[in-house]
Amino acid sequence: MRNKIFSSLYFQVLLAITLGVFLGHVYPDLGADMKPLGDGFVKLIKMIIAPVIFCTVVTGIAGMESMKAVGKTGAIALLYFEVVSTIALVIGLCVVNLLQPGVGMNVDPATLDASAISAYAEQAKSQGIIAFLLDVIPGSVIGAFASGNILQVLLFAVLFGFSLHHIGEKGKLIFNVIDSFSQVIFGIINMIMRLAPVGAFGAMAFTIGKYGIGSLVQLGQLIACFYVTCLLFIFMVLGSIARANGFSILRFISYIKEELLIVLGTSSSESVLPRMLVKMEALGCKKSVVGLVIPTGYSFNLDGTSIYLTMAAIFIAQATNTPLDLFQQITLLVVLLISSKGAAGVTGSGFIVLAATISAVGHLPLAGLALILGIDRFMSEARALTNLIGNGVATVVVARYCDQLDEQQMNEVLANPAAVQKVDQHG
């Protein structure tokens, strides 16, 4: 029993995170030097995300009987994403107005060091709905795979899957090759995931070593508000959605606990995308639904990022004594509904989108971003965890509404923790 606990990925990642916090706190310089361990692990995961999405989506779509089902899945998914993301934005707006974590700071924007956020501001200039939509179309197929752009790979995979389905029996050989290739890719994932504790240790040691636990105290009120809001959203909003669709949010969280710990260590929900594809399929969701909803959700269904964006923007207004009336806050909400779709599930993207939003709205001081730059890294954990749980719940809901969910299998898997071990042996 003891060997089983020690050999479980859950225990190893938890131990690694604890050791990372200890090293970063006691030996901050050494902890900061551990950054390459975390970066290396995330790069290994990113290396195989494009082929994983391609194989999953192509085999999922090409293997379907009706193409109408794919269109229905996409439409329901996008509608769900928009509704739930809006709820997340509104909840963030309500909580930050109710608790007012920035009131009383009386910060003069002119005294803030804007040079620290200049790089983010430059990146933010390229953010825009037209630019975002055009960016979904790759300059070349090879370029899409080389850059690892999730939406570009997804677009090509959907078109490839449709075409493969259309040619019927002639494409059977190609279908079998891609299906076999996907098994090889998931075998690689199993090898990479053995390094998850090393990646989590390095990322956590760097975070604590560079920013220090003390930096949490300075702006702790905003961090506390954000974490509480994320918990409220997960257990009240997502919990209600889960209950309405026949499953428990607590059991679902228990089912993906290893993935949540890896995300906690790396601050990137993208680091477990390949594993989530496998786990959601093992839960009873059809491959075609999983292949469309999970990758698309990484750009269109970032609930944690949505909460963060509204809270951070209003916090800056409160801290710098910038008055925002109801109309201006509604305008901010509408802009965020669009700009939040440009945030990918990677560390730092939420901050860039925040910079883009503040630039677009106009009546908030851009220099105010310097206030939360130091603690953004500490809030990214809650963002990524909420994003991951939100995308998992979305997959089950969409699968259920598209009649692509085996509810008996879902109930059996959620009731039986041993099922998780079977998933880990996939491929």
UniProtKB/Swiss-Prot annotation:
InterPro entries in UniProt: C4_dicarb_transport, Na-dicarboxylate_symporter, Na-dicarboxylate_symporter_CS, Na:dicarbo_symporter_sf
Keywords: Cell inner membrane, Cell membrane, Membrane, Symport, Transmembrane, Transmembrane helix, Transport
Membrane-crossing residue ranges in chain numbering: 5-25, 44-64, 76-96, 142-162, 184-206, 222-242, 307-327, 330-350, 352-372
GO MF assignments: fumarate transmembrane transporter activity; malate:proton symporter activity; succinate transmembrane transporter activity
Mode of membrane association: Multi-pass membrane protein
Keyword hit for Cell inner membrane: yes
UniProt-listed SUPFAM superfamilies: Proton glutamate symport protein
GO term, biological process aspect, one: L-aspartate transmembrane transport
Pfam families named in the record: SDF (PF00375)
GO cellular component: plasma membrane
Protein location: Cell inner membrane
Chief site of localization: membrane
Domain of life: Bacteria
Family to which this protein belongs: Belongs to the dicarboxylate/amino acid:cation symporter (DAACS) (TC 2.A.23) family.
Functional summary from the UniProt entry: Responsible for the transport of dicarboxylates such as succinate, fumarate, and malate from the periplasm across the membrane.
Protein name, per record: C4-dicarboxylate transport protein
Organism name: Aeromonas salmonicida (strain A449)
Lineage: Bacteria, Pseudomonadati, Pseudomonadota, Gammaproteobacteria, Aeromonadales
Gene: dctA
